[in-house]
Swiss-Prot record:
It is an enzyme of class 2 (transferase). The active site is at residue 182. Belongs to the ribose-phosphate pyrophosphokinase family. Class III (archaeal) subfamily. The gene is prs. It comes from Pyrococcus furiosus (strain ATCC 43587 / DSM 3638 / JCM 8422 / Vc1). Involved in the biosynthesis of the central metabolite phospho-alpha-D-ribosyl-1-pyrophosphate (PRPP) via the transfer of pyrophosphoryl group from ATP to 1-hydroxyl of ribose-5-phosphate (Rib-5-P). The keyword RNA-binding does not apply. This is Ribose-phosphate pyrophosphokinase. ATP binds at residues 31-33, 88-89. Binds 2 Mg(2+) ions per subunit. It catalyses: D-ribose 5-phosphate + ATP = 5-phospho-alpha-D-ribose 1-diphosphate + AMP + H(+). GO terms for biological process: 5-phosphoribose 1-diphosphate biosynthetic process; purine nucleotide biosynthetic process.
Length: 279
């Protein structure tokens, strides 16, 4: 049984075409508190709930859905979180701070046996979840979307930390891959250079987990153009776009596409097949 939370309503139509969805009542009390009610009995359920804006509200709703399902006799619960809130707060940078993602994952572990997230910022943080936790990369979906557009192109990561993401897509498509090396040349300027790869005359796909301002991608694109790249495409799992970022990035590249973990005007790649694989 699939339960769709308010944070994943934008995925409901596509999911409903392929799988039955459990009837759930979700509303707000006049004071703003959430009310949830499970309208069907069962033994196992998968909750799909993204936690992007309003993060706290959708997290509380995920907990209430878990509690309601347990109260209604469900014994085995999984939760799929397309976008995991607080995932970038994964370390203490100033004394007195929490490790926010740890707090969130421990709370979810009170109700859910298994957790599946799409491309979490730091996969190592999933160790904070007490049950089974899995990080899912939408490599197949991104590869399929760009396959014909890229031709015999190259996959690049914007930095070494994102190299595994580029590698996964490149291996599906049978293409070369590499990453940009960043070198600070002054207090205000960072130099970016593709490592050990020739982009001249090639189509290039730059891929990352999250795009916010798009500044890194724009700079990388400018460098690739100077090096003679043919077309430059940019993709990411999560489009956490700052104001004006889509417009600026779309002007700089040949195509910008992100998945629909967060609904945006450029959410052209669906992660629903990955959700359905868990049924």
């Amino acid at each position: 049984m699939l339960v769709i939370g308010s944070g994943a309503k934008h995925l409901e139509g596509e999911i409903k075409e392929k799988a039955p969805i459990t009837n759930v009542e979700i509303k707000k009390f006049p004071d703003g508190e959430k009310y949830v009610r499970i309208l069907e009995k069962g033994d196992k359920a998968i909750v799909v709930q993204s936690t992007y804006k309003p993060q706290d509200e959708f997290l509380i709703e995920a907990l209430l859905l878990g509690d309601a399902l347990r109260e209604n006799g469900y014994r085995k619960l999984k939760i799929v979180i397309p976008y995991m809130a607080y995932s970038r707060q994964d370390r203490v940078t100033k004394e007195g701070e929490p490790i926010s993602i740890r707090a969130v994952l421990k709370m979810l572990g009170l109700y859910y046996d298994e957790l599946y997230v799409m491309d979490i910022h730091n996969p190592k943080t999933l160790e904070f979840f007490p049950g089974r936790a899995e990080n899912i990369l939408p490599s197949k979906e991104i590869a399929e979307y760009f396959s014909d557009k890229l031709g015999e192109g190259i996959i690049l990561a914007p930095d070494k930390g994102a190299l595994e993401r580029a590698k996964a897509i490149a291996e599906i498509l049978g293409l070369e891959y590499s990453h940009f090396e960043k070198k600070r040349i002054s207090p205000t300027e960072v130099q970016m250079t593709p490592v050990n790869i020739d982009v001249k005359g090639k189509n290039v796909l730059i891929v990352d987990d999250i795009i916010s301002t798009g500044g890194t991608m724009i700079k990388a694109t400018e460098i690739l153009r100077k090096l003679g790249a043919e077309k430059v495409f940019v993709a990411a799992t999560h489009g956490v776009f700052a104001e004006g970022a889509i417009e600026r990035l779309s002007k700089a590249v040949d195509e910008l596409a992100v998945t629909n973990t967060i609904p945006t005007p450029v959410s052209k790649i669906s992660i629903v097949p990955e959700i359905l694989n868990l049924l």
